[in-house]
């Protein structure tokens, strides 16, 4: 297969794109906890109906096709999330956060929930199930193995294969999508095709008994929640390899877009590598005006994911509106999403990890009643830590983010000189890692204003927490932002946000109540528009003038009283998934998350 840029960042130009089961899979599945191995034919014909129930296993119907591993239930859904990232084990951005936080909230509402993701590293808490499956890849078969751990009410399933594990080493050099930022592995198409097919096997062949309420396989009455381009073909595999053979008859798929800019565009000639029937080719077919990964006709995984899913979602209502608004913000798939429809649900956040009343990284812990004084003390500690003059009366602006075009670090860097001319006294702390050119921009700002600006261009989780607690204003200069997590973290710590008016920032930040809006910035990642620089500088000036006033103290309180947990979003997700009408699916019950987020070794960008 030719060299491919599988997660190529899509720019904004016009485009025109809108057998036998054994051929695809051999079912060499070993049963977990002593279950007998199934022959290929038995595995293919097995129809389970595992339902969420209080560990009550009924006997199989005599004379029917149902095996002994049948669990019936009175409530709840079987939900299987599939994604390339799953925090805290693997994460490069919002996708990992969602698959880390949303599933436990769904489980707390009484649903049986699984997440399937690659095993990029030797995760110390994931155990070998001894269950294997052979997946059709190209002209041969690849054997995958399933690892499992049960955390916060969720079955975390890791697909083990050298295509995943051999790319990631230790905690500092691991790369999920490519060896360096902006460069993809040549075989990403094969890697994530393997993930999709393995994820479809997991609910049927894994007999999981860790949950105190559910036992046995998940069965076939399942809702698969696919996430981003890496899972685009899953619906096609479901239809061609299973439903056409009477398996997963009532299963449904939802496809969630976390970032439309990464679509999985490949050479059109690579379609046969997917081992899908010709009837799905039109769903992948795509033409754009770019030379990467090849010039001309391509296949587009995200396009197929959108068209073949039963429901399409994204991570905020305003981002959903932006995606269908035109080519520029819909990245050439706007016409497809107008056809299918799209639902936006704002993300939550992990309120146990980001909690100023318990945060071990900050100098002074606080809640809403003590926030104003505590934040002043934390500011002084932050100033001392980064080497700025210690003075609680100097407004402190912070920027935290990945240093890539989406987050607008170049716009922020360009706005700093203007802001310094407009405001007599201000300090700025910049934290982030990413592309070297952006790192140099931030360091250059520090060199130009050594007594007022500090740039930290390395990963530092402790400093990120300290900045949230000590900053007066959080600057978010995103060109586009599907949902955004940084502003939620800021509000959790009582730090109002000065943000671009895009995506989830519009849905979560209220002008004058919890932050300040700059207006929409240009999505052209190749230039820094002077008008955008002015928007950033003038909005930060406006925010700085409010710092220290009664109005600002009220904003701090407004931020901290927000419910930013996954509880509300999980209920919205439940309503959408129930609308798919999967057999046996019923509303869950409201509950609390089972345990705080575990801290494990993670795979990072």
Curated annotation (Swiss-Prot):
Residues that coordinate or bind ADP-alpha-D-glucose: 91
Keywords: Amyloplast, Chloroplast, Glycosyltransferase, Plastid, Starch biosynthesis, Transferase, Transit peptide
Entry function: Required for the synthesis of amylose in endosperm.
Catalytic activity entry: an NDP-alpha-D-glucose + [(1->4)-alpha-D-glucosyl](n) = [(1->4)-alpha-D-glucosyl](n+1) + a ribonucleoside 5'-diphosphate + H(+)
Annotated InterPro entries: Glyco_trans_1, GS/SS, Starch_synth_cat_dom
Pfam families: Glyco_transf_5, Glycos_transf_1
Organism of derivation: Zea mays
UniProt pathway: Glycan biosynthesis; starch biosynthesis
HAMAP family reported in the protein's UniProt record: Glycogen_synth
Protein's GO biological process: starch biosynthetic process
Gene: WAXY
Organism classification: Eukaryota, Viridiplantae, Streptophyta, Embryophyta, Tracheophyta
GO molecular function: alpha-1,4-glucan glucosyltransferase (UDP-glucose donor) activity
GO cellular component: a single term: chloroplast
Superkingdom of the source species: Eukaryota
Main location group: plastid
Family statement drawn from the similarity comment of this UniProt entry: Belongs to the glycosyltransferase 1 family. Bacterial/plant glycogen synthase subfamily.
Transit peptide location on this chain: 1-72
Matches recorded under Gene3D superfamilies: Glycogen Phosphorylase B
Protein name: Granule-bound starch synthase 1, chloroplastic/amyloplastic
PANTHER family: GRANULE-BOUND STARCH SYNTHASE 1, CHLOROPLASTIC/AMYLOPLASTIC (PTHR45825), GRANULE-BOUND STARCH SYNTHASE 1, CHLOROPLASTIC_AMYLOPLASTIC (PTHR45825:SF3)
